[in-house]
């Protein structure tokens, strides 16, 4: 049971807390040694802090004294003075590891201590740490020089000096005085009191943090929170009214102290989206005191509220819900407004008028998850018995006496800062911010839209049509445009052609679709100003059709094409600020007439490694990650061991949607693992690297077929035996460009193609996979028949798609197995149409492109017959590195191959592979050695099975029973009975039965081919 107590901070306490006598004698605290303290939080997440507690008879009734060193972001003034307490049953867990950041001078002194136990003794004595009693928390600050940055496996627990490891990090850190006095550190942020930064709160503030507590019907939308030092400097008391003003606007607000501890930077004042919206364009304000005689506002008898142009306001199914939410906003408080005040209202778009028909009008009874915001603006007001009231002055809205009237829409735009801040404040789904320096396509589209806006001022009625195409689904085309619309303060309208219902057999698609468009836009565009209209999947209804094959469909497409172009030109004349954007799989799918109207076409590829790193970094931002768990809100944190660079590398080829799904799976997995220890994790869920890797593997396995995501094989150099001589050539070709790309920035062309040739079974494919694994490269394996297609031009298109996928997934290896079947000598093929010659030509063109835009893409070919390859493939810049992979021609190589193949075997201890291979012929390939080892394992298993039969028979004879083999396995046998140990005799017997796959005559032929190639190079 939680109780509320007065809170006293003490800088002299070390680790334990002290309670007053009445709490000590409370029934719930008797026979308990630990309690948890919950401080009111500005982010809505309760953070329980567990202390070992003791009695202090001198404390006043119902009070607790806690050490200041247990809170890392505690200011020196304006601290919280109340908290909640609850006794903790049981004993705290023992921490396995404590990571402490300490001042470099102390670190150097402790480094001189020869034993780890001596370092532990220092902390035990210096900071009064009691073994198995003192609770250590993340964020603890000891003395002037130590800060606990992480504890494992929990966020708090006791230290056991015989078990707990202490890890020290050498660092320059602030002294405890400065650490506890963030306001003094940032005092100069307010050197100009006429330009104080106005920022938005991250979350609504609970009433327990308001000092003094205001009336229940107080207008909470005008609260502004000030750091202690700024309140003191302005000589303002917490809870008083002040006026924020600048050259644009003036707003009456109520000032409150931003109590410590809190997570806000002390470089501004923090308010609600309502106040921030009034200073939308210039959030720098001056603060002026307001006296009581200035607060005698009249109550309006009638207020007219207009809708701010938004697509939700035009949809009838949301009107009742929006009005209910607006009514509830005014019923819950006595609002203070003025002409022009912008009012944000959140709604759940999953509700509609059909659902609301049977629901009470009190919207508070509806349990919903709001997901979007609509805005209103005060456009007029009337008073009884007052005729000449200042148009800019404030007034009260009393739900009992004020009549509310909603009118038509008005054209207002909000800055991206206000829009995004409001989304975060209300906990609504945000929009990913694409940084223009990392996503060039975003910068290009922004420049085009801005140029169009400037050109429209000089030459109006210029239509602007964009197309974003990608053959990869959910690559982020719509989210890119939505992000741009927010950044440029454009309205955004999203229309999906897949959601348009056409009647079966309808012959007039144009009329249906254009009617749908007009219904969406004609009531919206007059009130929105600059607007991006996105029509998704336009190639679903407007696709290129051969009129000779389907005359009826061709006529429909022609009609829709002409009507849509006329519609766009007409609306561009009426509404000059409109930008029409389309998405499609490829612009080539669209009719030529419509394509000619598209001013700019952008191909959106899956994000590259740098872009994926940016996406993952933002998705893992700890300030935005929260999870609802029952009635509680949990904070999601990322473990320090997470390597974003590794994740960005291994997520090659995945779309932003897939990456977001990976993070959500990892959070869910971490929550499952942590939900039994939430108290000791302080309601924090740490997402570790293992959870993210498991989620990544799951997404890859689930979606690789549909999205074509390449994967990284799990083959290491240890799996490759006898090929160490070729590693240097591979390192030169692949490792050098990856680690030192600057060496190739001066025009020096890098090698990107390697050709493995030699007898079959010598490890060409295995070596290619080992390269991909060793350098963390993605791996595409291409077979010749996969590229062939019966339609003219499609085979060459397949080659282009393979290379484009590789560029999207770089760093990547494209492996052409049996490349002689893909690129034989041109002119020698008897196929009709010369398809193989065209494939070779396309392959040559793509290989030549690797030296320009193919950084990070490497081509590996493997063939048994290099003499059949087109000679152009072997010229510099293509497959210019030829590596012969022959048989193991020394005993050392043969022994290395045997060790690699039996790495996961249990072999007899008396086996010496150097001696074992002494009788093997030099005609064995790697595949032959693999067959030999597999056969030896099979013989060992056969031998073990016979031994088990004998053991069962002996057991039955000795015990007079007749048990089955299954019963013997389940109840009698030991692990040693079932261990399959491969003995020397198994290898020798397998060798006797093995026939080499390559004859001596064939080996001589391959040696001759090698000699010919080496002489010609």
UniProtKB/Swiss-Prot annotation:
Classification via CDD domains: RecA-like_PEX6_r2
Pfam families in the cross-refs: AAA, N1_PEX6, PEX6_4th
EC class name: hydrolase
UniProt key word Hydrolase: yes
Keyword tags: ATP-binding, Cytoplasm, Hydrolase, Membrane, Nucleotide-binding, Peroxisome, Peroxisome biogenesis
GO CC terms of this entry: ATPase complex; cytosol; peroxisomal membrane; peroxisome; transporter complex
E.C. numbers: 3.6.4.-
Main location: cytoplasm
Coiled coil: none
Gene Ontology MF terms: ATP binding; ATP hydrolysis activity; protein heterodimerization activity; protein transporter activity
GO biological process: fatty acid metabolic process; protein import into peroxisome matrix, receptor recycling; protein targeting to peroxisome; protein unfolding
Oligomer and partners: Interacts with PEX1; forming the PEX1-PEX6 AAA ATPase complex, which is composed of a heterohexamer formed by a trimer of PEX1-PEX6 dimers.
Annotated function: Component of the PEX1-PEX6 AAA ATPase complex, a protein dislocase complex that mediates the ATP-dependent extraction of the PEX5 receptor from peroxisomal membranes, an essential step for PEX5 recycling. Specifically recognizes PEX5 monoubiquitinated at 'Cys-6', and pulls it out of the peroxisome lumen through the PEX2-PEX10-PEX12 retrotranslocation channel. Extraction by the PEX1-PEX6 AAA ATPase complex is accompanied by unfolding of the TPR repeats and release of bound cargo from PEX5.
Family: Belongs to the AAA ATPase family.
Protein name, entry field: Peroxisomal ATPase PEX6
Gene: PEX6
């Amino acid at each position: 049971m939680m109780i509320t107590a007065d809170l006293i901070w003490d800088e002299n306490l070390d680790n334990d807390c002290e309670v007053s006598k009445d709490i000590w004698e409370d029934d719930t605290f008797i026979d308990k040694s630990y309690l948890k303290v919950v401080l009111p939080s500005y982010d809505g997440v309760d953070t329980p802090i567990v202390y070992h507690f003791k009695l202090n008879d001198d404390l006043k009734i119902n009070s607790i004294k806690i050490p200041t060193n247990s809170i890392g972001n505690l200011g020196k003034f304006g601290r919280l003075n109340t908290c909640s307490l609850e006794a903790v049953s049981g004993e705290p867990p023992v921490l396995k590891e404590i990571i402490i950041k300490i001042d470099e001078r102390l670190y150097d002194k402790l480094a001189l201590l020869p034993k780890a136990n001596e370092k532990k003794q220092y902390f035990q004595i210096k900071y009064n740490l009691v073994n198995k009693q003192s609770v250590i928390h993340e964020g603890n600050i000891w003395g002037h020089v130590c800060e606990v940055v992480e504890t494992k496996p929990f966020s708090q627990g006791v230290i056991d000096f015989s078990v707990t490891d202490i890890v020290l990090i050498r660092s320059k850190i602030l002294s405890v005085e400065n650490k506890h006095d963030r306001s003094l550190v940032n005092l100069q942020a307010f050197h100009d009191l006429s330009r104080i930064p106005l920022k938005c709160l991250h979350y609504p503030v609970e009433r327990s943090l308001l000092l003094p507590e205001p009336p229940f019907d107080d207008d909470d939308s005008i609260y502004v929170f000030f750091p202690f030092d700024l309140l003191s400097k302005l000589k303002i008391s917490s809870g008083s009214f002040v006026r924020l003003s600048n050259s644009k606007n003036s707003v009456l607000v109520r000032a409150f102290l931003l109590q410590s501890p809190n997570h806000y930077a002390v470089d501004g004042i923090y308010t609600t989206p309502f106040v921030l919206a009034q200073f939308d364009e210039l959030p720098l304000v001056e603060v002026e005191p307001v006296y009581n005689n200035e607060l005698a506002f009249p109550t309006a008898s009638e207020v007219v509220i207009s809708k701010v142009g938004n697509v939700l306001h035009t949809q009838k199914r949301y009107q009742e819900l929006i009005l209910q939410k607006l009514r509830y906003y005014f019923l819950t408080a006595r609002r203070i407004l003025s002409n022009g005040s912008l009012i944000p209202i959140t709604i759940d778009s999953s509700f509609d008028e059909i659902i609301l028909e049977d629901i009470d009008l009190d919207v508070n009874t509806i349990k919903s998850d709001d997901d979007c915001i609509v805005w209103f603006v005060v456009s007029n007001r009337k008073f009884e018995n007052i005729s000449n009231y200042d148009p800019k002055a404030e007034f009260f809205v009393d739900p009992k006496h004020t009549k509310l009237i909603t009118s038509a829409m008005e054209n207002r735009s909000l800055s991206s800062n206000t829009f995004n801040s409001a989304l975060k404040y209300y906990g609504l789904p945000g929009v990913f911010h694409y940084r223009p320096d990392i996503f060039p396509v975003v910068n290009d589209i922004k420049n085009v839209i801005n140029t169009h806006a400037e050109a429209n001022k000089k030459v109006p009625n210029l239509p602007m049509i964009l197309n974003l195409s990608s053959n990869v689904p959910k690559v982020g085309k719509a989210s890119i445009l939505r992000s741009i619309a927010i950044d440029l303060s454009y309205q955004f309208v999203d229309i999906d052609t897949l959601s348009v219902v056409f009647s079966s057999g309808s012959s007039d698609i144009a009329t249906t679709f254009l009617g749908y468009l007009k219904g969406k836009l004609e009531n919206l565009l007059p009130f929105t100003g600059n607007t991006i209209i996105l029509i998704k999947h336009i190639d679903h209804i407007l696709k290129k059709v051969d009129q000779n094959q389907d005359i009826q469909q061709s006529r429909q497409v022609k009609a829709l094409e002409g009507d849509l172009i006329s519609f766009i030109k007409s609306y561009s004349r009426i509404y000059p600020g409109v930008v029409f954007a389309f998405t499609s799989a490829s612009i080539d799918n669209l009719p030529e007439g419509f394509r000619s109207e598209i001013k700019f076409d952008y191909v959106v590829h899956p994000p590259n490694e740098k872009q994926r790193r940016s996406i993952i970094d933002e998705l893992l931002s700890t300030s935005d990650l929260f999870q609802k768990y029952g009635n509680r809100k949990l904070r999601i944190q990322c473990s320090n061991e997470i390597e974003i660079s590794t994740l960005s590398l291994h997520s090659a080829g995945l779309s932003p949607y897939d990456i977001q799904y990976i993070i959500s799976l990892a959070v869910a997995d971490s929550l499952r693992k942590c939900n039994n220890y939430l108290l000791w994790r302080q309601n924090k869920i740490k997402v570790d690297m293992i959870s993210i890797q498991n989620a990544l593997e799951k997404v890859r396995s689930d979606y690789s077929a549909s999205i074509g995501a390449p994967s990284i094989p799990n083959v290491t150099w240890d799996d490759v035996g006898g090929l160490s001589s070729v590693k240097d050539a591979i390192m030169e070709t692949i490792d050098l460009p990856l680690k030192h790309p600057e060496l190739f920035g001066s025009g020096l062309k890098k090698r990107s193609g390697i050709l493995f040739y030699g007898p079959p079974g010598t490890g060409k494919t295995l070596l290619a996979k080992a390269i991909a694994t060793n350098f963390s490269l993605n791996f595409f394996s291409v077979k010749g028949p996969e590229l062939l297609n019966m339609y003219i031009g499609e085979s060459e298109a397949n080659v282009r798609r393979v290379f484009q996928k590789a560029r999207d997934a770089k760093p990547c290896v494209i492996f052409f197995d049996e490349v002689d079947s893909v690129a034989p000598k041109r002119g020698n093929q008897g196929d009709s149409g010369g398809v193989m010659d065209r494939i070779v030509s396309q392959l040559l063109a793509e290989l030549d492109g690797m030296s320009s835009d193919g950084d990070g893409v490497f081509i590996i070919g493997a063939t048994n017959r290099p003499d059949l390859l087109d000679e152009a493939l072997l010229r510099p810049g293509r497959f210019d590195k030829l590596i012969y992979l022959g048989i193991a021609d020394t005993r050392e190589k043969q022994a290395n191959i045997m060790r690699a193949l039996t790495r996961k075997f249990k072999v007899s201890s008396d086996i010496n592979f150097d001696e074992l291979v002494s009788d093997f012929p030099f005609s064995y390939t790697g595949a032959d050695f693999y067959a030999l080892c597999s056969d030896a394992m099979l013989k060992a298993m056969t031998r073990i099975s016979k031994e088990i039969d004998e053991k069962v028979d002996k057991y039955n004879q000795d015990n007079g029973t007749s048990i089955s083999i299954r019963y013997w396995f389940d109840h009698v046998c030991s692990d040693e009975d079932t261990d399959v140990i491969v003995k020397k005799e198994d290898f020798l017997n397998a060798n006797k039965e093995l026939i080499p796959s390559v004859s001596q005559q064939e080996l001589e032929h391959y040696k001759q081919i090698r000699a010919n190639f080496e002489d010609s190079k």
